[in-house]
Protein backbone atom coordinates (compact mmCIF):
# COMPACT_ATOMS: atom_id res chain seq x y z
CA UNK A 1 0.00 0.00 0.00
CA UNK A 2 1.32 3.44 -0.92
CA UNK A 3 1.68 5.54 2.21
CA UNK A 4 1.18 9.23 2.73
CA UNK A 5 4.29 11.37 3.00
CA UNK A 6 3.90 13.70 5.99
CA UNK A 7 5.31 17.19 5.43
CA UNK A 8 6.47 19.22 8.42
CA UNK A 9 7.85 22.56 7.23
CA UNK A 10 10.24 21.45 4.46
CA UNK A 11 10.79 17.99 5.98
CA UNK A 12 9.23 14.95 4.30
CA UNK A 13 8.61 12.06 6.69
CA UNK A 14 8.00 8.74 5.00
CA UNK A 15 10.33 9.07 2.03
CA UNK A 16 14.03 8.37 1.62
CA UNK A 17 16.37 7.98 4.56
CA UNK A 18 14.82 7.85 8.06
CA UNK A 19 14.73 11.30 9.61
CA UNK A 20 16.77 11.95 12.76
CA UNK A 21 15.03 13.48 15.76
CA UNK A 22 17.10 14.78 18.69
CA UNK A 23 15.32 15.17 22.05
CA UNK A 24 15.86 18.21 24.27
CA UNK A 25 15.59 17.48 27.98
CA UNK A 26 16.23 19.56 31.09
CA UNK A 27 14.64 20.60 34.37
CA UNK A 28 15.25 24.34 34.13
CA UNK A 29 14.82 26.86 31.34
CA UNK A 30 18.60 27.31 31.24
CA UNK A 31 19.24 23.56 30.89
CA UNK A 32 16.58 23.25 28.18
CA UNK A 33 17.89 26.15 26.09
CA UNK A 34 21.46 24.84 26.42
CA UNK A 35 20.16 21.44 25.30
CA UNK A 36 18.46 23.08 22.34
CA UNK A 37 21.76 24.65 21.26
CA UNK A 38 23.44 21.23 21.45
CA UNK A 39 20.59 19.65 19.50
CA UNK A 40 20.82 22.30 16.79
CA UNK A 41 24.58 21.77 16.50
CA UNK A 42 24.00 18.06 15.83
CA UNK A 43 22.13 19.04 12.63
CA UNK A 44 19.04 16.85 13.13
CA UNK A 45 16.02 16.79 10.86
CA UNK A 46 13.73 17.67 13.75
CA UNK A 47 13.92 18.35 17.49
CA UNK A 48 11.70 16.89 20.20
CA UNK A 49 11.04 19.06 23.27
CA UNK A 50 10.42 16.62 26.12
CA UNK A 51 8.42 19.00 28.28
CA UNK A 52 7.80 16.37 31.00
CA UNK A 53 11.40 16.95 32.18
CA UNK A 54 10.69 20.68 32.72
CA UNK A 55 10.09 21.65 36.36
CA UNK A 56 7.23 23.99 35.31
CA UNK A 57 5.58 21.55 32.89
CA UNK A 58 2.21 21.87 34.67
CA UNK A 59 2.12 25.64 34.00
CA UNK A 60 0.92 26.11 30.41
CA UNK A 61 1.79 29.83 30.34
CA UNK A 62 5.39 29.19 31.37
CA UNK A 63 5.62 26.36 28.85
CA UNK A 64 4.42 28.62 26.02
CA UNK A 65 6.91 31.33 27.06
CA UNK A 66 9.68 28.74 26.92
CA UNK A 67 8.44 27.45 23.55
CA UNK A 68 8.85 30.95 22.11
CA UNK A 69 12.48 30.99 23.29
CA UNK A 70 13.03 27.51 21.88
CA UNK A 71 11.63 28.57 18.53
CA UNK A 72 14.02 31.54 18.40
CA UNK A 73 16.92 29.23 19.24
CA UNK A 74 16.00 26.51 16.74
CA UNK A 75 15.02 28.75 13.83
CA UNK A 76 13.33 26.78 11.06
CA UNK A 77 13.97 23.32 12.54
CA UNK A 78 10.71 21.40 12.99
CA UNK A 79 9.74 21.06 16.67
CA UNK A 80 7.91 18.05 18.13
CA UNK A 81 6.21 18.78 21.47
CA UNK A 82 6.03 15.79 23.82
CA UNK A 83 4.79 15.32 27.37
CA UNK A 84 5.77 11.73 28.09
CA UNK A 85 3.75 10.49 31.06
CA UNK A 86 5.39 8.56 33.89
CA UNK A 87 3.21 5.55 33.01
CA UNK A 88 5.01 5.40 29.66
CA UNK A 89 8.53 6.08 30.90
CA UNK A 90 8.34 9.86 31.29
CA UNK A 91 9.41 12.12 34.12
CA UNK A 92 6.04 13.41 35.35
CA UNK A 93 2.30 12.78 35.51
CA UNK A 94 -0.68 15.00 34.69
CA UNK A 95 -4.42 14.42 34.87
CA UNK A 96 -6.00 13.65 31.50
CA UNK A 97 -7.60 17.10 31.45
CA UNK A 98 -4.34 18.88 32.22
CA UNK A 99 -2.48 16.74 29.69
CA UNK A 100 -4.99 17.68 27.00
CA UNK A 101 -4.97 21.39 27.84
CA UNK A 102 -1.14 21.51 27.88
CA UNK A 103 -1.01 19.99 24.40
CA UNK A 104 -3.72 22.36 23.18
CA UNK A 105 -1.80 25.36 24.57
CA UNK A 106 1.35 24.25 22.74
CA UNK A 107 -0.63 23.77 19.53
CA UNK A 108 -2.29 27.21 19.81
CA UNK A 109 1.05 28.93 20.52
CA UNK A 110 2.20 28.60 16.93
CA UNK A 111 5.68 27.56 18.08
CA UNK A 112 5.43 23.80 17.49
CA UNK A 113 5.01 21.83 14.28
CA UNK A 114 3.99 18.46 15.68
CA UNK A 115 2.66 17.04 18.96
CA UNK A 116 2.92 13.58 20.49
CA UNK A 117 -0.26 12.23 22.07
CA UNK A 118 -0.24 8.93 23.95
CA UNK A 119 -2.73 6.36 22.69
CA UNK A 120 -3.56 5.29 26.24
CA UNK A 121 -4.46 8.80 27.35
CA UNK A 122 -7.88 7.71 26.04
CA UNK A 123 -9.82 8.03 22.80
CA UNK A 124 -11.50 11.30 23.81
CA UNK A 125 -8.18 12.99 24.64
CA UNK A 126 -6.51 11.71 21.47
CA UNK A 127 -9.41 12.88 19.28
CA UNK A 128 -9.46 16.32 20.95
CA UNK A 129 -5.71 16.82 20.50
CA UNK A 130 -5.88 15.61 16.88
CA UNK A 131 -8.74 18.02 16.13
CA UNK A 132 -6.95 20.98 17.75
CA UNK A 133 -3.70 20.15 15.97
CA UNK A 134 -5.17 19.71 12.52
CA UNK A 135 -7.15 22.95 12.80
CA UNK A 136 -3.83 24.72 13.46
CA UNK A 137 -1.84 22.92 10.73
CA UNK A 138 0.08 20.93 13.35
CA UNK A 139 0.83 17.24 12.76
CA UNK A 140 0.16 14.49 15.32
CA UNK A 141 2.25 11.49 16.35
CA UNK A 142 0.14 9.04 18.38
CA UNK A 143 2.40 6.93 20.56
CA UNK A 144 2.68 3.96 22.85
CA UNK A 145 5.73 2.94 24.90
CA UNK A 146 6.25 -0.30 26.80
CA UNK A 147 9.42 -0.22 28.92
CA UNK A 148 8.91 -3.74 30.25
CA UNK A 149 8.20 -6.03 27.31
CA UNK A 150 7.36 -6.50 23.65
CA UNK A 151 3.66 -7.34 23.18
CA UNK A 152 2.63 -9.92 20.57
CA UNK A 153 2.75 -8.87 16.92
CA UNK A 154 -1.06 -8.90 16.65
CA UNK A 155 -1.36 -6.50 19.59
CA UNK A 156 1.29 -4.14 18.23
CA UNK A 157 -0.42 -4.06 14.85
CA UNK A 158 -3.81 -3.43 16.47
CA UNK A 159 -2.38 -0.45 18.38
CA UNK A 160 -0.92 1.05 15.21
CA UNK A 161 -4.27 0.59 13.45
CA UNK A 162 -6.10 2.31 16.30
CA UNK A 163 -3.71 5.27 16.21
CA UNK A 164 -4.33 5.63 12.49
CA UNK A 165 -8.11 5.33 12.99
CA UNK A 166 -8.05 8.09 15.63
CA UNK A 167 -6.54 10.46 13.08
CA UNK A 168 -2.83 10.40 13.84
CA UNK A 169 -0.57 11.48 11.00
CA UNK A 170 2.15 9.11 12.23
CA UNK A 171 1.70 6.17 14.66
CA UNK A 172 4.67 5.42 16.93
CA UNK A 173 5.48 2.37 19.05
CA UNK A 174 8.53 1.76 21.27
CA UNK A 175 8.97 -1.52 23.12
CA UNK A 176 11.50 -3.25 25.37
CA UNK A 177 12.96 -6.53 24.10
CA UNK A 178 13.57 -9.47 26.40
CA UNK A 179 15.30 -11.40 23.60
CA UNK A 180 16.47 -11.02 20.02
CA UNK A 181 13.19 -12.67 18.94
CA UNK A 182 11.34 -9.68 20.42
CA UNK A 183 13.37 -7.39 18.17
CA UNK A 184 12.35 -9.52 15.19
CA UNK A 185 8.70 -9.23 16.26
CA UNK A 186 8.95 -5.44 16.23
CA UNK A 187 10.69 -5.41 12.84
CA UNK A 188 8.12 -7.83 11.38
CA UNK A 189 5.26 -5.57 12.48
CA UNK A 190 7.06 -2.55 11.02
CA UNK A 191 7.63 -4.29 7.70
CA UNK A 192 4.03 -5.49 7.48
CA UNK A 193 2.80 -1.92 8.05
CA UNK A 194 4.25 -1.04 4.64
CA UNK A 195 1.61 -3.36 3.15
CA UNK A 196 -1.36 -2.40 5.34
CA UNK A 197 -0.88 1.10 6.76
CA UNK A 198 -1.82 4.37 5.08
CA UNK A 199 0.57 6.51 7.15
CA UNK A 200 4.30 6.49 7.81
CA UNK A 201 5.20 4.74 11.06
CA UNK A 202 7.86 5.13 13.77
CA UNK A 203 8.94 2.02 15.64
CA UNK A 204 11.84 1.05 17.85
CA UNK A 205 13.02 -1.72 20.09
CA UNK A 206 14.85 -0.15 23.02
CA UNK A 207 18.10 -0.72 24.92
CA UNK A 208 21.23 -2.34 23.49
CA UNK A 209 19.49 -5.43 22.19
CA UNK A 210 17.10 -3.31 20.16
CA UNK A 211 19.73 -0.98 18.72
CA UNK A 212 19.50 -2.49 15.24
CA UNK A 213 15.88 -1.28 15.00
CA UNK A 214 17.07 2.33 15.29
CA UNK A 215 19.38 1.87 12.32
CA UNK A 216 17.43 -0.16 9.75
CA UNK A 217 14.33 2.00 9.26
CA UNK A 218 14.97 2.47 5.56
CA UNK A 219 14.84 -1.30 5.04
CA UNK A 220 11.91 -2.18 7.31
CA UNK A 221 9.88 1.02 7.14
CA UNK A 222 10.38 3.12 10.28
CA UNK A 223 10.38 6.76 9.16
CA UNK A 224 12.05 8.49 12.13
CA UNK A 225 14.82 7.48 14.51
CA UNK A 226 15.97 9.21 17.68
CA UNK A 227 19.58 10.18 18.40
CA UNK A 228 21.14 11.96 21.36
CA UNK A 229 23.04 15.24 21.55
CA UNK A 230 24.22 15.04 25.15
CA UNK A 231 21.70 13.44 27.53
CA UNK A 232 19.56 10.72 25.96
CA UNK A 233 15.84 10.46 26.66
CA UNK A 234 15.45 6.68 26.25
CA UNK A 235 17.52 3.51 26.54
CA UNK A 236 19.49 2.67 23.41
CA UNK A 237 19.76 6.13 21.84
CA UNK A 238 23.14 6.75 20.26
CA UNK A 239 24.89 9.97 19.31
CA UNK A 240 22.98 11.76 16.53
CA UNK A 241 26.00 12.46 14.35
CA UNK A 242 27.18 8.85 14.63
CA UNK A 243 23.63 7.75 13.80
CA UNK A 244 23.56 9.87 10.65
CA UNK A 245 26.80 8.32 9.38
CA UNK A 246 25.34 4.82 9.78
CA UNK A 247 22.03 5.76 8.12
CA UNK A 248 23.89 7.31 5.19
CA UNK A 249 25.97 4.14 4.66
CA UNK A 250 22.77 2.07 4.59
CA UNK A 251 21.05 4.59 2.29
CA UNK A 252 23.95 4.68 -0.17
CA UNK A 253 24.26 0.91 -0.36
CA UNK A 254 20.72 -0.42 0.07
CA UNK A 255 19.84 -0.14 -3.62
CA UNK A 256 22.96 -1.86 -4.92
CA UNK A 257 22.44 -4.97 -7.00
What are these regions, as identified by a protein language model?
Residues 104, 114, 119-257:
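Catalytic alpha/beta core domains of metabolic enzymes, predominantly
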Residues 1-7, 63, 185-186, 207-208:
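Short amphipathic alpha-helical surface micro-motifs
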Residues 9-15:
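Short boundary motifs at domain starts and secondary-structure transition points
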Residues 2-4, 16-135, 145-149:
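Active-site beta->alpha loop and helix N-cap motifs at the rims of alpha/beta catalytic domains
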Residues 1-9, 252-257:
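Short, Lys/Arg-enriched, disordered terminal segments
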Amino acid sequence: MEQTVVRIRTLEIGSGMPKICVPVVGKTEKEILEGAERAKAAKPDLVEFRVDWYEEAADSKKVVTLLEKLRKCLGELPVLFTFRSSREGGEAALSDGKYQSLNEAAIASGFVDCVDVELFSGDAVVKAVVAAAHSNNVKVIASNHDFEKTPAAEELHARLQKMEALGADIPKIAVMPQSSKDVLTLLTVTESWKETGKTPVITMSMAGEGLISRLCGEIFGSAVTFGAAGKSSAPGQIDAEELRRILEIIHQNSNRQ
